[in-house]
Amino acid sequence: MAALARGQEEGGDPRNRSGGGDGDAWRRWAVLVATVWIQALTGTNFDFAAYSSALKSSLGISQEALNYLATASDLGKAFGWSSGLALLYMPLHSVLLLTAVLGFAAYAVQYCCLVFANHTSSFTIPYPLVFLVCLIAGCSICWFNTVCFVLCIRSFSASSRPLALSLSISFNGLSAAFYTLFANALSPTSPAVYLLLNAILPLAVSILALPPILLCHTQGSSHLNSMPNHDRSVFLGLYIIASVTGIYLVVFGSFTTTSSTAWVILTGAMVLLALPLIIPACSSCSFMDTPDPALPLNHNDPHKPLLNHQTEPDAVMQKEMERQLQGSCGGSILDKGRLVVLNEEHSAKRLIGCVDFWLYYTAYFCGATVGLVYSNNLGQIAQSLHQQSQLTMLLAVYSSFSFFGRLLSALPDSLHGKMPLARTGWLAAALVPMPMAFFLMWKQQDGSALAVGTALVGLSSGFIFAAAVSVTSELFGPNSVGVNHNILITNIPLGSFLYGQIAALVYDANGQRMTVKDNRTGIAETMIACMGVKCYSTTFFLWGCITLLGLASSMVLFRRTKPAYATTASRSSYKNLHQVSS
């Protein structure tokens, strides 16, 4: 409030000012580019499949014990709330650097375990320590996400914020593809190089992103005043660049290449990643000093609700529509206790007692989380089907289609008013490919089915991961989204353990102790290994049935929340009509 008062004293009423001057314009776009870089190189959990077999061999553990390590990484996300606690006592850039250092230490320990255990038998790292560093690594990923989320919230108004968040989160899905390109260029036959990159690249990109982040901190509140028309053009350009980047990685990231060709492909990918830098430069040159027509609805006061803007006519209309909806639907079991309006704040206690939350929780738990577990097991799946040589391609496919799924999560905001489908309807539609993929891989376990199934799983889970924050905000209140979303994602470690345990038990039950030569490293190790379709056939069938449950849950959620979205849309139309008539 004090900062806002100073801004008004120095520059007058914010309503008489533009959507941020030249400096504010390029700074907020520079911040967005910084979050894109951070997200693109900090999704280190997505390349677990690239080194999981080697880690299993080095530690001499079973598939079940390996599953515990994957669960530890996902369990770290349950401690994501600690990032919010850190932000209460530390500046944002300090939290970013601390996160990078923690991630560096966690992956450095795993790298030492993988490298030295292969060559020096006397050197061992205790399994509990490896479990702990996997947990820390998973927690650091969640902290990176929080930093990017906060930066987008601080830098963009409510009208532009969903597009900024969607773009930033989308690039997290490309991490595995970028890491694969780096690994192919540096040492394509060594799984350990992924762990080395996991340690170094997030730290490097955090340091690189510091200047725009520090500039963001020095700004007042005036830069929050958006320019919808200008922003729309800039976002269109950024989304085009993002789409080209994703297509580039799909086309070139799937090939087995020579070292020199790999460096050329990597250079091209880095150029595309740097290309959004032209936006801040162009924004400062072509910025039009046009007032924001939606300025009265902007959020200059950080203590005000993010999305609750009700005028008196809105409140009257809302109550009238609530009575109508309750009268028409009150007798249906499906509608009992459902949400009536969007953006209504839910405390944690109220959230736990809300039927719609548990439908949403089930849809996530039986949908996107299954996709995440699939990506963790992709290394063993490829190995069991004699597709180990195609693992790099499969990682690139999963990563790229996860990216496109995340990118598509912006459709509800881009098509707002043109295609009035509730966001929960988009969520249900996104879950449709998931059971199709698992049943396809259950019936036909070969290279082509594996590639198609991996693409569908990546597309579906990517959309849900990116859309989840917006869905949580709309259904249960924007000001409670931090707490409520952290409650939601407790399903990730639970699902990681449960679904991973199913896969591990089926794998170990059908496997046998044998000497296996890794085609990538040439090292022969004695371990429990399973080869053939029997290793994951039952798992694919069970995962398919589970995702059908998630799809059914999302459809019920859509059915229950559709009237609430209709109420909000009608209120928005009424507001626009009232403004025009006045």
Tell me what each language-model feature is.
Residues 1-17, 213-353, 359, 564-582:
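Long, low-complexity inter-transmembrane loops of multi-pass membrane transporters
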Residues 45-55, 248-261, 341-343, 347-404, ...:
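Extracytoplasmic gate region of multi-pass secondary transporters
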Residues 48-51, 55, 141-167, 179-180, ...:
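Intracellular juxtamembrane helix-capping segments at the cytosolic ends
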Residues 68-89, 105-108, 112, 177, ...:
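Central cavity-lining transmembrane alpha-helices of secondary-active solute carriers
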Residues 79-96, 289, 405-421, 507:
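Helix-to-loop junctions at the C-terminal end of transmembrane segments
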Residues 101-123, 249, 253, 433-445, ...:
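C-terminal ends and interior cores of transmembrane alpha-helices
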Residues 106, 119-144, 449-463:
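Hydrophobic core of transmembrane alpha-helices in multi-pass small-molecule transporters
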Residues 353-378, 383-409, 413-471:
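C-terminal transmembrane helical hairpin of 12-TM major facilitator-type secondary transporters
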